[in-house]
């Protein structure tokens, strides 16, 4: 015979069942509290940072909106280079958590200056998806520099490196171009960049960056009158690359390998590889099957004035 709904046995059965369910629930909850947290972590509050560019002070707290609107799509909310657009981009967006930057005025392995990051935002990066952000005000750029610095603890523990000293550019001569060509061979630049600087050297297909992503050497021969190198368009910008290297890539620093003036000779030679570009170097050297014509005194060109050098200086 079925038990009555209000019988003592029915009440005891329901009470025991409820007690078991509650006990199991408490056990699961306790176990979850004791278990290690292996799920995704929510973004942690960012430490306030500042940047200093001339007489402008940037504040990270003032860049949150701009970063999320203009930068997070590629660089990610956490600054790790894993924004929703990143999977479609080549090269991948910069991972700010590593605090490793390509365009710097400081020696390899050191943090860039605030001015370096400021200039990179304004200038963009050639042959990448990093655009020119010259529509931002200087204050917005300074604030973004401060915000970028919140993503890595390196900025709390280390100071930015000292900017390298760039000696005055010597006159462009056939001698300097010839010496630069010899250095290009001796330093084995051709292994990556190719004998004609087209980025097609024998090692080009094997190169990877610091995240093991394929990376292409720069094609110097593609230059036009409006061309820019990765970190700028002036001869001073190219000079810096030889001394600072390009961190996060196979491009090393030659600061301990060559004399400062040797770097200028390399710059002058590289300009001649841009055969479609009108330059003082190509006014001297009209490439003819890669043969350098004899040097004459009339081919010497005076270096830029001090004012021009100063105007071309600054960050990366």
Give each language-model segment a name.
Residues 4-18:
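Bacterial N-terminal signal peptides that target proteins for export
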Residues 15-27:
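Bacterial N-terminal signal peptides
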Residues 29-34:
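Boundary at the C-terminal end of the N-terminal hydrophobic targeting segment
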Residues 36-50, 57, 68, 131-215, ...:
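Flexible coil segments in periplasmic/lumen-exposed cytochrome c-class electron-transfer proteins
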Residues 57-73:
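Mature N-terminal segment immediately following signal peptide/propeptide cleavage
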Residues 64, 76-114, 135, 181, ...:
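Gly/Gly-Pro-rich "capping" loops immediately C-terminal to redox-active cysteine motifs
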Residues 75, 97, 149-152, 193, ...:
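Protein kinase-like catalytic domain
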Residues 84, 103-112, 116-145, 243-267:
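Axial heme c-ligation environment in periplasmic c-type cytochrome domains
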């Amino acid at each position: 015979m079925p038990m009555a709904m209000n019988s003592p046995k029915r009440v005891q059965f329901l009470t025991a069942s409820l007690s078991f369910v509650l006990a199991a629930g408490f056990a699961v909850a306790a176990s979850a509290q004791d278990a290690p947290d292996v799920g995704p972590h929510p973004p942690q509050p960012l430490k306030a940072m500042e940047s200093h560019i001339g007489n402008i002070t940037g504040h990270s707290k003032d860049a949150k909106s701009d970063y999320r609107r203009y930068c997070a799509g590629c660089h990610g909310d956490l600054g790790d280079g894993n924004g929703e657009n990143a999977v479609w981009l080549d090269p991948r967006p910069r991972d700010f958590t590593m605090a490793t930057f390509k365009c710097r005025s400081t020696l390899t392995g050191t943090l860039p200056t605030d001015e370096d990051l400021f200039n990179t935002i304004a200038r963009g990066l050639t042959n990448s998806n990093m655009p020119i952000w010259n529509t931002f005000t200087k204050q917005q750029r300074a604030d973004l520099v401060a915000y970028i610095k919140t993503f890595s603890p390196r900025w709390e523990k280390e100071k930015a490196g000292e900017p390298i000293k760039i000696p005055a550019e010597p006159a462009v001569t056939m001698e300097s171009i010839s010496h630069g060509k010899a250095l290009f061979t001796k330093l084995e630049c051709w292994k990556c960049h190719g004998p004609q600087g087209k980025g097609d050297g024998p090692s080009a297909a094997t190169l990877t960056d610091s995240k093991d992503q394929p990376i292409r050497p720069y094609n110097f021969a593609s230059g036009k009158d409006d061309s820019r190198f990765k970190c700028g368009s002036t001869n001073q910008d190219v000079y810096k690359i030889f001394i600072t290297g390009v961190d996060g890539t196979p491009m090393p620093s030659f600061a301990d390998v060559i004399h400062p003036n040797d770097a200028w000779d390399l710059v002058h030679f590289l300009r001649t590889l841009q055969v479609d570009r009108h330059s003082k170097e190509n006014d001297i050297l009209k490439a003819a099957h890669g043969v350098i014509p004899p040097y004459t005194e009339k081919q010497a060109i005076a270096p830029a004035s001090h004012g021009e050098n100063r105007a071309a200086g600054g960050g990366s």
